[in-house]
Amino acid sequence: GPRRAILYTSLTPGQLPLDQPIDAACGALAIFVGIDDATGNLLFVANRLAWYPDSLLGDLKMDIGLLETIQNSKPLRGEEYEAFYQMLAAAGRTAAGELSRRAYNQLVHDAKQLGDKQREIEAAGLPLSEDDRIEEAVLETRLDYMRKNASHPFVPLVEHPDRFNGELIMLRGTAYRIVKVRINESEIRKRFGIDHYYQIDMRVNLEHKVKLITSRTAEGEEDKIREEKIVTQHPATFCALSLPPGMPTGDHLLEPIRVAGFYFKNWQYQTAEMRGDQAAERVAPMLIGRAPVWD
């Protein structure tokens, strides 16, 4: 029958409490070191404890504790690759169209919550402060955007990325670049059965105009130069395991797509645009999913 085991590990998920009983689905790639003579417990050591909570990603066997390694508004780092490939593999375990259906259902639920909140404000019948009027206008704008585009509001994904890591999101936009990325690491190919994925760079229409503020350091100067401009579109990146039949790849594309994927991070990347003698840097939400819908 089942035997009690003791695992010694250097890393545990930060959301799991210490020094108290828990009931959590966990696992580890561990080394068996022996049996405790006094208790008969099996003894193991491992680098980290994997956590599979009752959530879509947890059900798809992604170690949710790896989301804690992600740093938003920074380039993709080596420490994040395990989370990246586990999320990619998790997307591959879904049925065709499953992520789109689930994301749409979540979108309907979120729209209902926003609608309920909007009605609460209207039903109160109280004089609105300036902040309340702004909140009401934002709610109305986001609801209108969700209903017309069947996609999640985009601006919060950039303003508050820490709220969305690991969440299922649906976006609609235009793919302007699609490249096939080959995975060179043999261990990754063997463990996950993945030898490539597609990076889709797309532009998404925003729910409202946004002031984009960037900074750069001029050549020979120490102080950063602040730059501002009003934008109505924003880039996003979608990493997919496959493409629809016949979908083109390369640069200078104008392909209408819908994507449903897990929000990995708001990542920083270099663009083809030059500022002085350096490539300009931008940040954009990165989603990971099974395949885009080509409209």
Predicted regions and their residues:
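OB-fold and OB-like single-stranded nucleic-acid-recognition modules
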Residues: 1-295
